[in-house]
């Protein structure tokens, strides 16, 4: 186990007398960062000519330049650079990055993020409580401060609509809160329709958190649901996609986490939602920024620091944007006394920024872990001693020996309920297409821009459930693509133009015990193996990033119209309008299954 963890810094309650002595000059600090400008997230000002005194991994004081006259402290000269608090990401899913918590920490620290709040519902959907607790153990050994928002919607809907590996009941969630101190909130309550309609299971889960004084995170689409959602105790959401619903949510007392992501992905809603501030005049005091989902490649390129700079581009002052990226997330979860600012007693989680507000150095608990944009030997050693997941996590893809992945060709005129994909890939259209009698599927593909899609149950909980569907506008012209990260139940989703290539893709994932792949002419052209729960790699984030880059190249060659992370969302049966799970095609507004074909 690494000695560079959240627990390396003692609790403030055990350090107050010592820190008071250091701040008063009666004791020497361990480290003094001199020659700095300081970004205060409390007053939202940049203060010139300051030095930061650090002892025992905590800030003793921020003082005027030249205050330190001792001789025992290590001196770091910031040379006029800007010191700011480490960033705090209030909503992420580590599993989306396809790396473990320890590996995730490497990318986060390179980007100046020192604290994250993780909803581990992905691994919970595969391995139930055992998966959540394995990730908590992983997080405890990581060189980062990782808190849990307990998964609230596992499965995302109901056993009638999909088969998940996990089933986190109110009783299991209550037990997680009672056992794990770092379980600080209830994770995003995605089944917002059920919450609004008063579903008994959903409200029992809400009660498990509220009875213990834990805040509830949300996930809601549609202004018509906001009032009931807020009345049910939900007090934050990251799903505000435009200024109108953002304004509704603020007025309902719900914190906003503005989600930023690469514009080619489904996660870049910040530019529209931030207009509640820049156009409608709302205060930014209950608004933070978050990343939500990143793959390993994008995690290195588009961290929370990038999202914070996007807020600046959208009209926020740098001091405001950095507060939204640090103090506000900490405040939402009641941890502003420990992180999010440079006040006395806070953890010494700091970043040195260049003039473009890009992190150059990162200190975690007073230890220099990133210097000149490269990890230090101290961090490299910590990252080399990663947590080993339980053996059961490496055996979660359980498929029948034979499964048919394509539907029978209709012999009569029918109406097909197809799934229309559109950029960026979050919402999917329900498109009814009339298919005339034909002897070949290729005729329908050419005429209507279709391809096959199937979802195969992989948890070993059914007799080999497989559902068939048709994608329109996906633009896959040949071959197949497949993923074991089919949100949120994480069954295997396969799309293709022919049964043979789809079978190759399915079996490649089975052999690797998880992954994302592209197949052309019977050969796997790209593969990201994900052997831990079918979701995570056991490699360093930089290695996984290279595998993801290669996958993206082949994905683009295949012609797919949405990125693979959008493809992974196709089974997510809580986002309109139509989805496919292992049980069939789900009409989301009605929460019911419809057959692929009906008589014309």
Curated annotation (Swiss-Prot):
The EC number(s) this enzyme carries: 3.5.4.2
Catalytic activity annotation: adenine + H2O + H(+) = hypoxanthine + NH4(+)
Cofactor (UniProt): Mn(2+)
Transmembrane segments: none
Swiss-Prot/TrEMBL keywords: Hydrolase, Manganese
The UniProt record lists the keyword Transferase: no
Position of the signal peptide: none
Highest taxon of the lineage: Bacteria
Keyword Glycosyltransferase: no
UniProt protein name: Adenine deaminase
Any one GO biological process: adenine catabolic process
Any one GO molecular-function label of the UniProt entry: adenine deaminase activity
Species name: Chelativorans sp. (strain BNC1)
Family the entry assigns: Belongs to the metallo-dependent hydrolases superfamily. Adenine deaminase family.
Enzyme class (EC, first level): hydrolase
């Amino acid at each position: 186990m690494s000695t560079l963890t959240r627990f390396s810094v003692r609790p403030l309650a055990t350090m107050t007398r010592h820190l008071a002595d250091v701040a008063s000059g009666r004791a020497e600090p361990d480290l003094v960062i001199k020659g700095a400008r300081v970004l205060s997230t409390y007053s939202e000002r940049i203060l010139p000519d300051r030095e930061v005194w650090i002892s025992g991994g905590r800030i003793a004081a921020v003082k005027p330049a030249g205050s330190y006259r001792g001789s025992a402290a290590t001196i770091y000269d910031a040379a006029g650079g800007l010191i700011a608090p480490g960033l705090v990401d209030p909503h992420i899913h580590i599993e989306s990055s396809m790396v473990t918590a320890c590996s995730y920490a490497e990318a986060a620290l390179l980007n100046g993020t020192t604290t994250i709040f993780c909803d581990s519902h992905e691994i919970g959907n595969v391995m139930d409580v055992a998966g959540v607790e394995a990730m908590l153990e992983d997080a405890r050994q990581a060189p980062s401060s990782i808190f849990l928002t307990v998964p609230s919607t596992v499965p995302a809907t109901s056993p009638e609509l999909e088969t998940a590996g996990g089933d986190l009941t109110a009783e299991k969630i209550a037990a997680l809160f009672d056992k794990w101190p770092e379980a600080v909130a209830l994770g995003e309550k995605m089944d917002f329709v059920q919450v609004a309609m008063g579903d008994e299971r959903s409200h029992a889960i809400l009660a498990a958190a509220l009875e213990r004084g834990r805040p509830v995170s949300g996930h809601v689409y549609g202004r018509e649901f906001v009032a009931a959602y807020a009345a049910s105790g939900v007090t934050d959401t990251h799903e505000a996609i435009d200024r109108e619903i953002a304004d509704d949510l603020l007025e309902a007392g719900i914190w906003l986490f503005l989600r930023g992501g690469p514009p080619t992905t489904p996660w870049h809603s910040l530019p529209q939602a931030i207009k509640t501030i820049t156009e409608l005049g709302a205060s930014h005091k209950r608004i933070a920024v978050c990343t939500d989902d990143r793959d390993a490649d994008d995690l290195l390129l588009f961290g929370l620091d990038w999202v914070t700079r996007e807020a600046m581009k959208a009209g926020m002052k740098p001091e405001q944007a950095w507060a939204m990226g640090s103090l506000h997330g900490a405040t939402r979860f009641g941890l502003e006394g420990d992180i999010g600012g440079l006040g006395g007693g806070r953890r010494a989680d700091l970043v040195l920024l260049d003039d473009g507000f890009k992190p150059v150095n990162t200190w975690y608990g007073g230890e220099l872990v990133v210097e000149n944009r490269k990890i230090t030997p101290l961090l490299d050693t910590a990252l080399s001693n990663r947590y080993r997941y339980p053996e059961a996590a490496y055996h979660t893809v359980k498929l029948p020996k034979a499964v048919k992945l394509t539907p029978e060709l209709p012999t009569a005129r029918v109406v097909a309920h197809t799934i229309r994909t559109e950029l960026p890939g979050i919402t999917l259209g329900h498109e009814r297409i009339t298919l005339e009698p034909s002897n070949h599927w290729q005729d329908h593909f050419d005429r209507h821009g279709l391809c096959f899609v199937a979802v195969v149950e992989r948890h070993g909980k059914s007799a080999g459930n497989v559902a068939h569907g048709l994608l329109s506008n996906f633009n896959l012209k040949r071959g197949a693509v497949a993923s074991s990260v089919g949100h949120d139940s994480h069954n295997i989703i396969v799309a293709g133009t022919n049964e043979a290539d789809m079978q190759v893709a399915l079996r490649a994932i089975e052999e690797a015990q998880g992954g994302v792949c592209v197949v052309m002419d019977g050969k796997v052209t790209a593969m990201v193996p994900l052997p831990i729960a079918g979701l995570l790699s056991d490699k360093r984030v930089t290695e996984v990033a290279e595998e993801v880059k290669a996958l993206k190249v082949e994905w683009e060659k295949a012609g797919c119209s949405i990125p693979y992370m959008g493809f992974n969302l196709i089974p997510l049966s809580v986002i309109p309008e139509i989805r496919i799970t292992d049980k069939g095609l789900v009409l989301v507004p009605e929460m019911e299954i419809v057959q692929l074909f009906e008589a014309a």
